[in-house]
């Protein structure tokens, strides 16, 4: 992947000091996330075109494609957005066992002032998990499932099947 064409997607690949990643300001972090979304859109649309051309089967993807572009390339009944309360996304970010999240957590703990580093990183997370962004997804016109700790995985699948008309 070319750094000039995809500077945000190649940012972590070319990073010399991972401490720089967790030391970014909320403005820098938000700009990077927005840039990743734009760059992923280009690649993911090409991948989807290729997949669609090779099969007649339904294709399910977890995507970074923006809501605006999804409205251009799909109809409302073919997209599902899964949302968690923004506070959960921020406060419980490191509770998940994902290797990437645990790697970032360890980086933050190794910072000279780990408490300050953690506060800064949570501010970055707050920025990209803002109520404004949440409402943009909520009011996108696409199907939305909001996180409910009392809902089982089977119940979530049943909701998804119903929304996509797969249970007919």
Residues of each region from the PLM?
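Structural motif
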Residues: 60-62, 80-81
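A glycine- and Lys/Arg-enriched "phosphate-lid" helix/loop adjacent to the NTP-binding pocket
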Residues: 78-129
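Short, well-ordered beta-to-alpha junction loops that form the rim of enzyme active sites
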Residues: 63-66, 149
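NTP-dependent small-molecule kinase module
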Residues: 127-168
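ATP-dependent small-molecule kinase phosphotransfer cores
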Residues: 2-58, 64-65
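Alpha-helix-centered segments that form part of catalytic cores
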Residues: 34-49, 114-139
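Short, well-ordered alpha-helical microsegments
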Residues: 66-70, 153
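Short glycine-/polar-rich loops that comprise or flank the Walker A/P-loop
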Residues: 73-78, 140-142
């Amino acid at each position: 992947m070319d750094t000039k064409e995809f500077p945000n997607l190649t940012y972590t690949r070319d990073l010399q000091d991972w401490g720089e990643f967790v030391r970014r300001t909320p403005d820098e972090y938000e700009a990077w996330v927005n840039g990743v979304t734009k760059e992923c859109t280009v690649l993911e649309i090409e991948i989807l075109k290729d997949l669609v051309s090779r099969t007649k089967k339904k294709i399910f993807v977890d995507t970074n494609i923006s809501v605006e572009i999804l409205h251009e390339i799909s109809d409302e009944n073919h997209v599902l957005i899964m949302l968690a309360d923004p506070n959960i996304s921020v406060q419980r970010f490191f509770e998940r066992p994902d290797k990437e999240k645990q790697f970032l957590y360890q980086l933050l703990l190794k910072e000279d002032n780990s408490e300050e580093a953690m506060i800064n990183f949570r501010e970055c997370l707050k920025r990209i998990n803002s109520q404004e962004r949440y409402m943009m997804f909520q009011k996108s016109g696409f199907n939305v499932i909001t996180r409910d700790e009392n809902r089982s995985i089977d119940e979530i699948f049943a909701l998804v099947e119903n929304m996509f008309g797969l249970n007919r």
